[in-house]
């Protein structure tokens, strides 16, 4: 099959299950896990539970694998954290490296978008980020309508997670 590291292959398969939970909110798997393990939050916010099943804890491990590689596509910016999430379109470091502005520690990307024009607020961006990151942010297209932020898998052309690309990603991270 071409897999040399069975643990890494297993991690890529667990990430596939996490992707299914993330993208298929109407699935029976999502509904059952939602009731039992994350009734008051989203799958992305769910925590490891000491009394959680092995299956649940394994899928959360798969979610962590996904989060290492996934990127956020900016819609309205209401979900994506400026300094913590992977939203910059650069290969090796998709997080913002510019120093955090103390008063904006938990801020979301939405504060960088002008509400009336749905364009980047260049004055704000130029004052908060390094020149390289300013250019990266300005190169991110924004939706004219208020779309939701979505996660995507950037390592294949159709941006949908598949185990093979997950395995390759994990091998490249070694």
Task: Tell me what each language-model feature is.
Residues 1-174:
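A helix-boundary/hinge signal
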């Amino acid at each position: 099959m071409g897999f040399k590291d069975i643990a890494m292959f297993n991690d890529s398969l667990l990430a596939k299950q996490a992707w299914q939970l993330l993208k298929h909110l109407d699935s029976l798997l999502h509904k059952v896990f939602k009731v039992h393990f994350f009734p008051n939050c989203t799958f992305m916010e769910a925590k490891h539970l000491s009394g959680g099943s092995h299956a649940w804890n394994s899928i959360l491990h798969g979610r962590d694998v996904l989060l290492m590689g996934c990127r956020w596509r900016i819609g309205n910016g209401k979900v994506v954290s400026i300094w913590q999430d992977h939203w910059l379109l650069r290969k090796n470091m998709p997080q913002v490296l510019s120093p955090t502005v103390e008063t904006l520690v938990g801020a979301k990307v939405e504060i960088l978008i002008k509400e009336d024009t749905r364009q980047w607020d260049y004055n704000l961006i130029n004052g908060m980020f390094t020149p390289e990151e300013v250019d990266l942010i300005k190169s991110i297209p924004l939706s004219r309508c208020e779309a939701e932020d979505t996660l995507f898998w950037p390592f294949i052309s159709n941006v949908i997670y598949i185990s093979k690309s997950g395995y390759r990603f994990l091998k490249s991270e070694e």
